[in-house]
A protein has these predicted regions:
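Extracellular adhesion/carbohydrate-binding repeat motifs centered on closely spaced tryptophans
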Residues: 1-78, 167-181
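General structural signal for secondary-structure boundaries
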Residues: 34-37, 68-77, 124, 128-135, ...
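Secondary-structure boundary elements
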Residues: 76-137
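A glycine-rich, coil/turn loop motif that links secondary-structure elements
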Residues: 122-126, 141, 170-172
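Periplasmic OmpA-like peptidoglycan-binding domain that tethers envelope proteins to the cell wall
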Residues: 131-146, 156
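Hydrophobic/aromatic-rich core segments of domains that either
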Residues: 146-211
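Short, solvent-exposed mixed-charge patches
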Residues: 217-219
């Protein structure tokens, strides 16, 4: 991966924020591309390992890489993902394989005790709402929604793309059950804890026994 770029106009090394081939990057004063989150003045740049800026934050306001303000819902979901990444960094090690990190995150979710905090009402950004039960106030426990939404966000933080949270009813009450779906397989932390760990860790829908009525992608 190239860490230095030069301006086609001046021939000098890029310094600071630059748009290259439609993507945004940040270079330090020596012209080296940053590949970790970076603070410049009052702005925090959230940067992927490929150097591409994913978002910016100034004060309490979140922006897209291009400087456009994120809608409140989108900003809330992105900040939830940042919390998930912080948890992953805290509970895994660089020497772990991807599958080891994945299962470590699953086990971290299971350690939280059961507690129903609210009745499901299909709230705006409800996957992030329930994930923050553990990311922000984990000592208060959570239910199947908290478990599954948290694990879904942790999976996204690990780089998994096809991540969903599912519910087996379209009712707005406490009758539904929630689980995570990742790459087409079911991951149900609550059932793994209460019934059979491996039966509900990476289950097929044929063996799982429930079908999704609500299915929401976690981005």
């Amino acid at each position: 991966m190239r860490r230095h770029y030069f301006s086609p106009k001046t021939g000098k090394a890029c310094i600071g924020l630059h748009k290259i081939d439609g993507k945004y990057y940040f270079f330090n004063k020596y012209g080296i591309m940053k590949i970790v989150n970076t603070v410049d003045g009052k702005t925090t740049y959230y940067i992927g390992s490929d150097g591409v800026i994913q978002a910016r934050k100034k004060g309490n306001t979140m922006y897209y890489a291009n400087g456009k303000k994120k809608m409140n819902q989108t900003a809330y979901e992105y900040e939830t993902l940042l919390r998930a990444k912080a948890v992953v960094a805290a509970i895994t090690t660089p020497g772990m394989s991807q599958s080891e990190k994945f299962q470590t995150c699953y086990n971290w979710v299971i350690k939280h005790y059961y507690n129903t905090r609210r009745i499901f009402q299909n709230q705006t950004s409800w996957p992030a709402l329930y994930a923050n039960d553990y990311f922000l106030t984990g000592s208060q426990g959570g239910d199947c929604f908290s478990d599954s939404c948290t694990f879904a966000y942790l999976a996204r933080a690990l780089g998994y793309k096809n991540v969903y949270v599912c519910v087996d009813t379209d009712l707005f009450d406490d009758s539904g059950h929630c689980w995570a779906e990742i790459n087409g397989l079911v991951y149900d932390p609550l059932f793994s804890e209460a019934k059979n760990y491996y039966k509900y860790f990476g289950a097929t829908y044929a063996s799982y026994g429930l079908s999704p009525i609500r299915r929401v992608r976690v981005n």
